[in-house]
Amino acid sequence: IPSKKDFLLTQSIFPTVEMRAVKWRTKDSGRFVNVAKYRAFNASVPFATREAWQTSREGALPPLGQKLLVSEQEQILLEDSHGSDQDRLIDLLYDDVERHVEAIRSRLELACGDVLADGKFELLQENGLTLEVDWNVPVENRPTARIPWSDPTSDPIADEQRWIRQLDDIGAPAPELVITSAKAYSYLAENNAYRAAYYGSVSPSTTPTAMLNPQQINVVRGNYSLPPITFYKAQVRVDGKSRRVLPEDLWILVPPDREKWAQTMYGVTAEGLVLSRGTNPEIIREDAPGLIITRGVQDDPVQIWTKGAAVGMPVMHTPDAHIVAKVL
C-alpha cells in the first residue's frame, strides 16, 4: 500500500528503517587530532594527546495502532442477504487494511513533524501515554529571522546565508534542500532584497516594483548557491479535525545522507512475533518488523474486528546537522 504523496517526512526526509528490535539507539563518537609540531634537530619529539569521545542513548520504541469493528448488526444484515454480500464483507476487511496502514503512517508523519518543529518527540496523555524524548537540537539550529519575511524590508538572502554559515562553522554538510510552506515562500516574490538581487539594483529607488515569478526567484537562489525548495503541505486528521503536520512559518534546511541524520524506525510488534511463531497464518521471522494487520473474533457480543499495529517513532541521530528557522 503506497504512502500518501504528501507524506514526504516518512518517505524521504526521515527515511524508514525496519529493525528486529524493540529499542531505538543512537551513538555519537569522534576524535580530535592536533597538528604535529616542528622541532629542532637533536631535540626530542614532543608527546601528543589522544582526544576521543563516544556517547550513546537508547529507549523503547512505543507501540501504536487501532481497531475497527464489523458490528453485530452489520453481520446480521450481510447474512440476511443470503450470502450474496459475502464479497462485501471481504471488501470491507480489505478496506480496513488500507485504513489501518494510512492511520499508522499518518501518525508517524505527524510525529516526524513534531520532531522537526521543536526537536522533541512528545506524547501528552495520548491514549493514557505521556512520553518525551528530547533530541537536544542546539538553540543555534532553531533561529528566528531578524525581521519576519512577511515584511518586504526583511533580508531572507542574508538570513539564509547566515544559517548556512552556522552549519559550515560546526562542520555540518551543506543543506541539500529546503522544506517550507507555499505561504512562507510567497513572501519572497515581493521582497526588496530578492528584487534588488534579481535586477542588480544598488538603490531601492531604482528597483522595479513588479513581483518576481518562481523562475526569477530561482535565479536569485541559484546566484547565491541557495538550496532548492520543496513545498510541504501534508495534513492529517486527529480526532476528526484536520491538522497541519508542520507549521507554515518554518524554513527548514535539510542535510544530505539523511539516514545518518534521522530515521523513522519500525520495530517488532508482539503481533508480528506471534505470527512468526505460528503456522496458520504464518509469516517468516524476517518479516516480523514493521506494520502488522490482524483479524479477530469475539463472541459476546458477536463481533469481528481488524487491528493495525506497529512499534515505531522518529529518531534523530545528528541533532545539529539541520536548521529549523521561524521566518513569519
Short names for language-model regions:
Residues 195-328:
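Sequence/fold signature of self-assembling virion shell proteins
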Residues 13-16, 167-172, 295-298, 314-315:
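A general structural signal for short secondary-structure junctions and capping/turn motifs
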Residues 61-140, 155, 159-184, 302-308:
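Long, contiguous amphipathic alpha-helices that act as assembly "spine/axial" helices in icosahedral shell
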Residues 158-218:
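Ordered core of a single globular domain
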Residues 12-80:
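Assembly/oligomerization interface modules of large self-assembling protein complexes
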Residues 6-10, 161-165, 290-292:
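Short alpha-helical segments and helix-capping/turn motifs at coil-helix boundaries
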Residues 146-153:
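Surface-exposed cleft-lining segments at the edges of enzyme active sites
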Residues 1-22, 315-328:
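N-terminal alpha-helical "arm" segments
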